[in-house]
Regions:
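SH3/SH3-like beta-barrel fold
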Residues: 51, 71-75
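Short, conserved beta-turn/loop elements at beta-strand boundaries and strand-helix junctions
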Residues: 66-71, 96-97
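Short, surface-exposed beta-strand-loop junctions and turns on beta-sheet-rich folds
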Residues: 67-68, 78-81
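Short glycine-rich, low-complexity segments
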Residues: 1-55, 81-97
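Short beta-strand-centered aromatic/proline hotspots
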Residues: 59-65
Length: 97
């Protein structure tokens, strides 16, 4: 069965209406061991969240769904929010506001 997050009212998820902050926050001093705990990132639902992946550059994310092994929502591409998802084991650390 394919991963299908729940949808909001009228069958669509709502992207944020404003861009995220201009600059990324300071990186946390501690990183997760193997994978981010779903309960920890669940506190960031519907909030601007900065994600540092294990590989690659960090990015702004607006999570709308947290599953056992992944999180989905909207990723800022520098111009607009795009619907996206990421596996929790690919996240090294995160901070939400």
């Amino acid at each position: 069965m394919a991963f299908m997050p729940p949808f909001g009212p009228q069958g669509t998820q709502q992207a944020p209406t404003a861009p995220p902050p201009q600059s990324p926050p300071p990186r946390p001093l501690t990183a997760s061991a193997l994978a981010v705990d779903p309960g920890a990132i669940r506190g960031c639902l519907f909030r601007n969240t900065y994600i540092w992946p294990r590989n690659g550059q960090g990015f702004w994310f607006y999570p709308t769904f947290v599953g056992r092994t992944s999180v989905s929502g909207f990723r800022w591409n520098g111009f607009f929010w795009m619907y996206s998802g990421i596996s929790l084991d690919r996240i090294e650390s995160f901070t939400c506001f």
